[in-house]
Amino acid sequence: MKVLGLDVGDKKIGVALSDELGLTAQGLTVIYRTSLKKDLEEIKKIIDLHHVTEVVIGYPRNMNGTAGPRAELVKRFARELYKFTGIKPVFWDERLSTVEAEKLLISGDISRRKRKKVIDKLAATLILSGYLNYKSKN
């Protein structure tokens, strides 16, 4: 049972994938957004290639727990993904995932240029990892 993690942004979608047992998360790729149709096709290819059975999407919340300004866009994307793939996405609180990813990359002495290329993939990995940890404890 592989799980796909997505960090959906305006320009890029970070993608992470779990191992077969659903215990660990690894960054997979970054999709540079062009159109909704092409984005969905790209994700569907990944789902089919890796035999994904579950999809987790980072859900943007404010620090007080309310839905963030991008929440409606993410919900709309999730609805379209469900229609396209038949897999109903699970939302996972992505508060501070990008901030945490940035801190990890800075602490690893990764250059700004390289950080820009991988931050979305790392954020997706953190989102998926949080979800997998929660599932393993419940």
UniProtKB/Swiss-Prot annotation:
Keyword match Plastid: no
Name of this protein: Putative pre-16S rRNA nuclease
UniProt record, GO biological process: rRNA 5'-end processing
Keywords: Cytoplasm, Hydrolase, Nuclease, Ribosome biogenesis
Family: Belongs to the YqgF nuclease family.
Domain of life: Bacteria
Annotated EC: 3.1.-.-
Organism of this sequence: Carboxydothermus hydrogenoformans (strain ATCC BAA-161 / DSM 6008 / Z-2901)
Main function: Could be a nuclease involved in processing of the 5'-end of pre-16S rRNA.
First-level EC class: hydrolase
Localization per Swiss-Prot or TrEMBL: Cytoplasm
UniProt cross-references to InterPro entries, sorted A to Z: RNaseH-like_sf (IPR012337), YqgF (IPR005227), YqgF/RNaseH-like_dom (IPR006641), YqgF/RNaseH-like_dom_sf (IPR037027)
A Pfam family hit: RuvX
Main location: cytoplasm
Cellular component terms per the entry's GO annotation: cytosol
The keyword Nuclease appears for this protein: yes
GO molecular function, a single term: nuclease activity
